[in-house]
């Protein structure tokens, strides 16, 4: 399959999956799922679906729910997009967003520590300067 066609097809699959999970599923847990990426095999028989969920939601339960409906979802994707095969879906939790949030927080904490150190060093310099001017020759 040509790379451009594959990319467009993957994008269409991603949109269709999101729509199916939001509109067709009765399981409320699946309403909190965001499809972050999909990878379709060249023969279109296998589809790896990466998803994330809101913090505080039980990702293991959500994964189990996704596993229960993957046959239906696969068939709907194939029917809607007129695929030759209904791809075998494998869902994988995508923690990259959570990792990114943690990294940003760590960087912010480091920045705050650096600011505190700079403030302390400026205070030390001003104290040293004041002491020097108060000395008698």
UniProtKB/Swiss-Prot annotation:
Instruction: Look up keyword Cytoplasm and say if it applies.
Output: yes
Alphabetical list of InterPro entries matching this protein: KH_dom-like_a/b, RbfA, RbfA_dom_sf, Ribosome-bd_factorA_CS
What are the TM regions of this chain, as residue ranges? Answer: none
Gene Ontology terms, MF aspect: ribosomal small subunit binding
Q: Which UniProt keywords apply?
A: Cytoplasm, Ribosome biogenesis
Compartment(s) where it occurs, according to its Swiss-Prot or TrEMBL record: Cytoplasm
Show the ranges annotated as biased composition (Basic and acidic residues): 127-137
Using the UniProt record, give the first listed, main subcellular location: cytoplasm
| GO CC annotation terms, alphabetical | cytosol
Q: Which GO terms describe its biological process?
A: maturation of SSU-rRNA
Give the matching PROSITE patterns.
Answer: RBFA (PS01319)
Gene3D superfamilies xref list: 3.30.300.20
Q: Where is this region: Disordered?
A: 112-137
Read off the Pfam families from this record. Answer: RBFA
Q: How does it assemble?
A: Monomer. Binds 30S ribosomal subunits, but not 50S ribosomal subunits or 70S ribosomes.
What the record says about family reads: Belongs to the RbfA family.
NCBIfam families documented for this protein: rbfA (TIGR00082)
What does this protein do, in the record's words?
A: One of several proteins that assist in the late maturation steps of the functional core of the 30S ribosomal subunit. Associates with free 30S ribosomal subunits (but not with 30S subunits that are part of 70S ribosomes or polysomes). Required for efficient processing of 16S rRNA. May interact with the 5'-terminal helix region of 16S rRNA.
Can you say what this protein is called?
Ribosome-binding factor A
Name the encoding gene, please.
rbfA
């Amino acid at each position: 399959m040509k790379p451009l066609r594959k990319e467009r097809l993957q994008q269409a699959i991603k949109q269709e999956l999101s729509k199916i999970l939001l509109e067709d599923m009765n399981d409320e847990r699946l309403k909190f799922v965001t499809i972050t990426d999909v990878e379709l095999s060249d023969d279109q028989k296998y589809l790896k679906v990466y998803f994330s969920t809101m913090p505080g939601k039980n990702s293991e339960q959500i994964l189990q729910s996704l596993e229960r409906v993957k046959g239906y979802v696969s068939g709907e994707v194939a029917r809607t997009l007129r695929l030759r095969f209904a791809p075998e879906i494998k869902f994988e939790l995508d923690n990259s967003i959570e990792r990114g949030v943690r990294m940003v927080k760590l960087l912010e904490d480091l920045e705050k520590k650096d600011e505190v150190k700079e403030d302390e060093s400026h205070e030390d310099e001003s104290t040293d300067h004041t002491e020097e001017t108060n000395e008698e020759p």
